[in-house]
């Protein structure tokens, strides 16, 4: 069984945390301040996850391109 990279483990752990946050928010049992803190953490996790997915997509596009000499370069997301 191949080892997972640190990034994929981090992505999976972040996704699990995000799912837990969503469940807690949907329960409606949190105080307002706690709900806001959870929401803020969820937004941070979602943005980080989007960045990881964009980087993975770029790597796949490069690997599937016709240019056999294409090099992988670090992905720099556009700032909003």
UniProtKB/Swiss-Prot annotation:
<keyword id="KW-0269">Exonuclease</keyword>
<keyword id="KW-0963">Cytoplasm</keyword>
<comment type="subunit">
    <text>Heterooligomer composed of large and small subunits.</text>
</comment>
<dbReference type="GO" id="GO:0006308">
    <property type="term" value="P:DNA catabolic process"/>
</dbReference>
<protein>
    <recommendedName>
        <fullName>Exodeoxyribonuclease 7 small subunit</fullName>
        <ecNumber>3.1.11.6</ecNumber>
    </recommendedName>
</protein>
<dbReference type="Pfam" id="PF02609">
    <property type="entry name" value="Exonuc_VII_S"/>
</dbReference>
<keyword id="KW-0540">Nuclease</keyword>
<dbReference type="GO" id="GO:0009318">
    <property type="term" value="C:exodeoxyribonuclease VII complex"/>
</dbReference>
<dbReference type="GO" id="GO:0008855">
    <property type="term" value="F:exodeoxyribonuclease VII activity"/>
</dbReference>
<dbReference type="InterPro" id="IPR037004">
    <property type="entry name" value="Exonuc_VII_ssu_sf"/>
</dbReference>
<comment type="function">
    <text>Bidirectionally degrades single-stranded DNA into large acid-insoluble oligonucleotides, which are then degraded further into small acid-soluble oligonucleotides.</text>
</comment>
<dbReference type="GO" id="GO:0005829">
    <property type="term" value="C:cytosol"/>
</dbReference>
<dbReference type="InterPro" id="IPR003761">
    <property type="entry name" value="Exonuc_VII_S"/>
</dbReference>
<keyword id="KW-0378">Hydrolase</keyword>
<comment type="similarity">
    <text>Belongs to the XseB family.</text>
</comment>
């Amino acid at each position: 069984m191949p080892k997972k990279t640190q990034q994929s483990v981090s992505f999976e752990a972040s996704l699990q945390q995000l799912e837990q946050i969503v469940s807690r928010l949907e329960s409606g049992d949190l105080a307002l301040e706690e709900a806001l803190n959870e929401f803020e953490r969820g937004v941070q996790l979602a943005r980080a996850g989007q960045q990881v997915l964009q980087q993975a997509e770029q790597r796949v596009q490069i690997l599937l391109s016709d240019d056999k000499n294409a090099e992988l370069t670090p992905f720099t997301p556009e700032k909003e």
